Amino acid sequence: MSVTLDLQLACADTDGLPGEAQLQGWLDGTILGFQEEAEVTVRIVDEAESRELNLTYRGKDKPTNVLSFPFEAPPGMELPLLGDLVICRQVVEQEATEQNKPLEAHWAHMVVHGSLHLLGYDHIEDDEAEEMEQLERDIMQELGFADPYLNDEE
């Protein structure tokens, strides 16, 4: 059982980013509960790249915390490629500050949240959102973090 991490640092300032071992642990803690083998690219970017991707793929002209790009293998081809996560450093840092959350916990939450999207979970419909948020809470707790939605409900 393994998750292979391809880490890409595409931001100007890499000081204070989660380390490869941290990212690997968060991916393992999320994905290995669903499948035995996977390959995931985590690309940490600045606001300009996040904004461009968010506009291109979601029609939103602003940077966002995490974008998930699931890999869809051609029919009949089985590959362990799960997909790509693109995480915007500045947005994650700003949200952690605004939400009074430890930065490490918010980084972990973005990896968990994005990984669940790669696994096919979504939060468009209320019932899907409840299921996904509960999975996030459970996984974050297993990883040693507080409920990521606690501050959102106050």
Swiss-Prot record:
Record-linked InterPro entries: MetalPrtase_cat_dom_sf_prd, YbeY, YbeY_CS
Source organism (scientific name): Aeromonas salmonicida (strain A449)
Coiled-coil zones: none
Known cofactor(s): Zn(2+)
Classification via SUPFAM superfamilies: Metalloproteases ('zincins'), catalytic domain (SSF55486)
Keyword entries, A-Z: Cytoplasm, Endonuclease, Hydrolase, Metal-binding, Nuclease, Ribosome biogenesis, rRNA processing, Zinc
PANTHER family per record: ENDORIBONUCLEASE YBEY, CHLOROPLASTIC
Protein name: Endoribonuclease YbeY
EC annotation from Swiss-Prot or TrEMBL: 3.1.-.-
Enzyme class: hydrolase
Top-level taxon of the source organism: Bacteria
Molecular function terms from GO: metalloendopeptidase activity; RNA endonuclease activity; zinc ion binding
